[in-house]
C-alpha cells in the first residue's frame, strides 16, 4: 500500500477540538491506549495516536480510490447530517445521513429493488409523468418518492455493495458496523473514549460529538479520496 505524507497538523486538530473525549465515568477501558490524560472529569485523547490512525486511514482510502473502489459514508445524527452529505458529494461517495435501514447491506437485493423504484419515480417526475395523473394518484407517488429519497437518496446511484464504509458515531451506527462485519467490508470509524476500537478495521480516536472535529476528520479523508481518484485518472496511470 502506497504511503503519503498527509501533512496532519496537531495545532489544527486542537483548534477543531478533536482531542476532547467523554466524561471519565463513561469511558471504555479498551480506549486506554489512546487516552493522553484526564482533565476536570473529561478524558483527553492522545493526538499523536489520532494522527497516526488518520494517516493510515488516508493511505487506505487513497489507494482504494486510485483503484476505482467505492465508498459509503454513514452518520445519521441530525446535527451532522449536512456534514456527511457535503463530504460525500464533494468526494463523489455514497452516503446515509438520515436513518440506517436494517439490512441495507446484508439484504442488498431488497434495497436494490427499492432503489430501482426510486430511480423510476425520479425519471417519471422529471419527464412530467406525474402531471397527467389525478391529484390523489400524484400525491401518493410524490409521497413515495419523498420517503424513498429521504432514506435512500444518498445511495441512489450505488449499484453494488461499497468497498469501504466510513462511519461517524459508533454507538448510533452499530447496526451498520455489524452488517459490515458480516459481509467483511472494511470500516473506518471515528471512536470516542466511550467506544470499542476493536469493532472497526481502522479506528480514529477522536471527538465524535463536535461538528468542528467531525468536519476536520471528514475533510482529511475526502481529500485523500479525491487525490486517489485524480491519481487513477492521470495519463501515466491510464496506460
Curated annotation (Swiss-Prot):
UniProt GO MF annotations: structural constituent of ribosome
Single GO cellular component term: mitochondrial small ribosomal subunit
SUPFAM superfamilies: Ribosomal protein S2 (SSF52313)
Pfam families per UniProt: Ribosomal_S2 (PF00318)
InterPro entries for this protein: Ribosomal_uS2, Ribosomal_uS2_bac/mit/plastid, Ribosomal_uS2_CS, Ribosomal_uS2_flav_dom_sf
GO biological process, one term: translation
Localization (cell): Plastid, Chloroplast
Chief location of this protein within or outside the cell: plastid
Gene3D superfamilies in the cross-refs: Glucose-6-phosphate isomerase like protein, domain 1 (3.40.50.10490), Helix hairpin bin (1.10.287.610)
PANTHER family reported for this sequence: 30S RIBOSOMAL PROTEIN S2 PROKARYOTIC AND ORGANELLAR, SMALL RIBOSOMAL SUBUNIT PROTEIN US2M
Stated family: Belongs to the universal ribosomal protein uS2 family.
HAMAP family: Ribosomal_uS2_B
NCBIfam families, sorted: rpsB_bact
Protein known as: Small ribosomal subunit protein uS2c
Organism annotation: Psilotum nudum (Whisk fern)
Gene name linked to the record: rps2
Amino acid at each position: 500500500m502506497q504511503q503519503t505524507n498527509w501533512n496532519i497538523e496537531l495545532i489544527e486538530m486542537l483548534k477543531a477540538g478533536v482531542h476532547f473525549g467523554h466524561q471519565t465515568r463513561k469511558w471504555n477501558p479498551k480506549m486506554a491506549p489512546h487516552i493522553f490524560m484526564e482533565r476536570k472529569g473529561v478524558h483527553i485523547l492522545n493526538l499523536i495516536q489520532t494522527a497516526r490512525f488518520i494517516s493510515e486511514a488516508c493511505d487506505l482510502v487513497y489507494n482504494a480510490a486510485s483503484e476505482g473502489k467505492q465508498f459509503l459514508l454513514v452518520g445519521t445524527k441530525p446535527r451532522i447530517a449536512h456534514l456527511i452529505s457535503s463530504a460525500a458529494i464533494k468526494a463523489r461517495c455514497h452516503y446515509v445521513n438520515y436513518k440506517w435501514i436494517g439490512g441495507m447491506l446484508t439484504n442488498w437485493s431488497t434495497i436494490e429493488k427499492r432503489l430501482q423504484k426510486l430511480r423510476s419515480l425520479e425519471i417519471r417526475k422529471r419527464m412530467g409523468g406525474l402531471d397527467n395523473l389525478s391529484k390523489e394518484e400524484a400525491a401518493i407517488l410524490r409521497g413515495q418518492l419523498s420517503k424513498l429519497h429521504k432514506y435512500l437518496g444518498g445511495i441512489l446511484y450505488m449499484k453494488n455493495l461499497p468497498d469501504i464504509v466510513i462511519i461517524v458515531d459508533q454507538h448510533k451506527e452499530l447496526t451498520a458496523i455489524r452488517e459490515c462485519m458480516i459481509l467483511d467490508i472494511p470500516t473506518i470509524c471515528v471512536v470516542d473514549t466511550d467506544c470499542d476500537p476493536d469493532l472497526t478495521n481502522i479506528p480514529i480516536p477522536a471527538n465524535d460529538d463536535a461538528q468542528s472535529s467531525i468536519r476536520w476528520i471528514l475533510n482529511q479523508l475526502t481529500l485523500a479520496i479525491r487525490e486517489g481518484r485524480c491519481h487513477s485518472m492521470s495519463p501515466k496511470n491510464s496506460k
